[in-house]
């Protein structure tokens, strides 16, 4: 069986961020599976268009990447999403997998990062242990992408899990979800965590 791993990310328009995160993941997977074809796909159409226009990079969609693997004679595929939640992008990826299922002898898909109760606990522990020294006594705010999908509730759940584990004022705001940074600022004022609206980013995640 000719095998491949397809790494699917939302993508980013920031080259440095892409190299530090998405490319780093690909490199690590390549080291672990040196005899396996490693393919990449970008699930966001907007990001793909930006990469093509500004960087002259023809990033593949999940469907295009799967078709490419078929043309290469691949018969077994592991689809590895880096999506945090099982929202719109992850579901579109899964739809692409279903469209191509008959093209391969075997194709399996990993879950998004936050898919079950244990995931929230594990991610909360990892985040807090890596950032508690930076946070110190200050409240810690995470910014997520957010979505209109019902999976947007995942951000509230991970906030609750973080607070329970860290015993620290932790907040999660989103760019496109229900809970905005303005909502978080109001909550911080109500809780007496902060009396001003000037926020300083310690680290970009």
Give, region by region, the residue ranges found by the protein language model.
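Flexible, D/E/H-enriched segments
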Residues: 199
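Extended amphipathic ligand-handling, pore-lining, and cofactor/metal-binding catalytic surfaces
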Residues: 1-196
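Single conserved hydrophobic/aromatic residue that forms the stacking wall/gate
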Residues: 202-205
């Amino acid at each position: 069986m000719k095998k491949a791993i397809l790494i699917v990310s939302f993508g980013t328009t920031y080259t440095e961020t892409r190299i530090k995160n998405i490319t780093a993941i690909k490199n690590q997977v390549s080291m672990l599976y040196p005899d396996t074809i490693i393919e990449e796909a970008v699930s966001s159409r907007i990001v793909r268009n930006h990469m093509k226009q500004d960087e002259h990079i023809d990033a593949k969609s999940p469907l295009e990447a799967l078709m490419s693997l078929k043309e290469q004679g691949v018969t077994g595929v592991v689809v590895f999403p880096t999506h945090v939640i099982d929202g719109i992008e992850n579901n579109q990826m899964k739809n692409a997998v279903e469209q191509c299922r008959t093209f391969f002898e075997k194709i399996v898909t990993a879950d998004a990062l936050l898919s079950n109760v244990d995931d929230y606990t594990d991610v909360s522990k990892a985040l807090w242990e890596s950032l508690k020294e930076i946070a110190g006594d200050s409240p810690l705010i995470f910014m997520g992408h957010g979505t209109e999908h019902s999976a947007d509730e995942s951000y509230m759940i991970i906030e609750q899990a973080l607070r329970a584990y860290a015993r620290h004022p932790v907040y999660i705001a989103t760019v496109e979800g229900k809970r905005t940074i303005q909502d978080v600022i109001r909550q911080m004022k109500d809780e007496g965590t902060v009396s001003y609206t000037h926020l300083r980013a310690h680290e970009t995640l």
